[in-house]
């Protein structure tokens, strides 16, 4: 066993003595040592209950004959970090999470690992660490929050953000706003729609590294604790069989994950995270795969923020394995990839049942004929940009409008809420990329303001920043290269016409080639003052969003 290096032999007497200080017995020294990575804390609603999930994992490890050891990592709630300096630290936390786990699991040679994340950057950060370490592993998340209820309908955090815009224009009164604030988030779990956290936890199922139901079983259901026990038992079996993450996760696994993402209409952040995770697994993954597959995979699940359903409804309808059954029915699922169950994913999916034909529609009756995400290219995005196609209003699928340029998200939000943005405008928010922010903040407030102000059918937004999984509308993020790296988004001027064609996947600045070249030649990127030692280092090492916003390798 990998842990024998601290347990066996004369030279390891001091090591055993220290382990006995923890209460470890001689019998336990002969068993697999299982590390459990916990991101429990008391400030993230999606993580406040993870101590109970971790206890269930520990029970499962012991049931299977292993010895559990819990160690922590950090986490940030993007919702609470939104609209202030804290959002600059959200995406950078992903790298710290992966690094910290790699450090602990290398300093202590565990035989296996169970990863217990839940929210936006924590799940991908843990998956990156899993790929790097390549130790037998299982991921079990904390699960989604239940939707809130107000006035006879389900609501969630995005309802709150959009209600703020509605209040500004008199569509929502103060009493209603307060009621929505009080009721939208009823308890523990990751926010209730198909936002980034729930998308990533769902894609972990499709990758084969998490138990069935990982992405959809609500946080407060007892089934979540049973799944956590199962995760603890599964990892011990993987250790005994010496099955490692790279034996499970292949390019075909990523293709399954992308297809699930497109079929469900997942978060745009998945493009960023899947690219980074693939790099950690040593897999060559081109983001163009999203666009190639989106032409084949229809959008079949209409889940918040683009539809009326929530994750609990998807769970009731059969969950992610039922979505994969639709792929299987149409001959698209990559069936031969392995899973943590030591069974092929195709065999497991055959056992799945689709329990609601409206929540998970057949391919011949989709919500949209193409997948939920698209990659756009053009003279404004030579390395690509990302759009949530399932959230684009029909009349905005092709749009030409004048640019209104902002150098950060706060400026843009103030302008939108004060009525300075008019129908037809294209809001351009730049210097919000990985390097320029630094930290590639989410632009949830400006997009929610556009929706709340009743402009979603008439205003587009493009940015080198990114979006919350809750953003929707004619919005395009991850524009690469970013302005801080000399990208063309940096040369846009107020009043320039911008053409967006979601159908053709193009994003272009409508100026002459000569003018374009002149501006690019004369362009000097703005350099922002950075008041954080870590963010200065992050900005120095981070790469483009098109490369997953991972660090440059020495």
Swiss-Prot record:
Record has Magnesium as a keyword: yes
Catalytic activity: (2R)-2,3-dihydroxy-3-methylbutanoate = 3-methyl-2-oxobutanoate + H2O; (2R,3R)-2,3-dihydroxy-3-methylpentanoate = (S)-3-methyl-2-oxopentanoate + H2O
GO cellular component: cytosol
Residues binding [2Fe-2S] cluster: 119, 191
UniProt keyword list: 2Fe-2S, Amino-acid biosynthesis, Branched-chain amino acid biosynthesis, Iron, Iron-sulfur, Lyase, Magnesium, Metal-binding
Alphabetized InterPro entries for the sequence: Dihydro-acid_dehy_C, DihydroxyA_deHydtase, DiOHA_6PGluconate_deHydtase_CS, ILV_EDD_C, ILV_EDD_N, IlvD/EDD_N
Protein name, UniProt field: Dihydroxy-acid dehydratase
